[in-house]
């Protein structure tokens, strides 16, 4: 159902010169553009036509392909007209200026075509967000997972979970109103406990899928840590094939956080070089060390670098202290660096310690093996297999699923304590409402404005 009274227009191809430039018009006056700009009062539906594009005086501005999609069978659910001409910005601007001279047509806001598609019921909010994720994907895996969400896979997960809550709540409320005709009182506890545990398991599985999708979308954070002068910055440069980080023989050279993106087998990894961890009286270096710990807390994978040409035992003590100080369980790999030096002495026992990898940042030996180690560690920990079943998800989705899980775990405790069936039914309703925020069944205008404002012009 069309909920808008005005008509919008925008260029949908990128700015600058290109071989093709596309203009999209959506709304009640879309066909008015056909009459005024194309001099046509009839267009075949969803059929490409080669026509001239005219200004209001009848002069030809350009020639190209025209596509007509009458609503509701269009992307936005409204009448949609697309003009595909030459991609010269001058021509595009002339056409848009001509179209805007028709009363009732205005320029589209960023993301407004997708917003109209959502508000007209053509896509849900999770699918709308996946459009932006697909456009902005920085790796093959992220693009594939975004397409899965655009096709509705993540929405299916959420809607099926909502159905689980609905069925459970229906049983519970029937028990409240018609206790003599529903579940036998002796079996009520067993039924409720079984359903609670089953749904909790479903929430956890979907949340893990969402976390995986969020990581694919944003990139896997890999923090390079260790003592000063162990070769952390050299390792970042070697892994990224850049000279991004400054490398010197002086301990404490790196004092700020340095980021570099790399793609391994279609997956985005964000390498993060940090200040060497040590006790120092230098206030500037201490700021860098504090920032290093902030990144370590958020890392999906940590590369702890050990200088294989120096005393390894002391460095392993530092490593053990490092492990004890971590607040969460992270995937950690020890990287024995400087294998090209004659002083390098690492025995087989040390090599096997915590998936130890031997490298030389200077010569490149072992660097590709380390890159593949990062990928397969990610693949193993998240059980990724060519993105089958993996969806694009955002932090807000994970936050909502976490709130639902926390609420339902609390409901489980309350049920065991007081067996209040009305309270349980109310908790189920709350969880349903929270999940509705993912697909947009229950949402606020402020949230919609925030989401669609991130889209590019033309989407």
From Swiss-Prot:
Domain TrmE-type G: 219-379
Its EC number(s): 3.6.-.-
Main location: cytoplasm
Subcellular location(s) per record: Cytoplasm
Keyword vocabulary terms for this entry: Cytoplasm, GTP-binding, Hydrolase, Magnesium, Metal-binding, Nucleotide-binding, Potassium, tRNA processing
GO cellular component terms attached to this protein's record: cytosol
Cofactor entry: K(+)
Record-stated family: Belongs to the TRAFAC class TrmE-Era-EngA-EngB-Septin-like GTPase superfamily. TrmE GTPase family.
Known function: Exhibits a very high intrinsic GTPase hydrolysis rate. Involved in the addition of a carboxymethylaminomethyl (cmnm) group at the wobble position (U34) of certain tRNAs, forming tRNA-cmnm(5)s(2)U34.
Protein name: tRNA modification GTPase MnmE
Species annotation: Buchnera aphidicola subsp. Baizongia pistaciae (strain Bp)
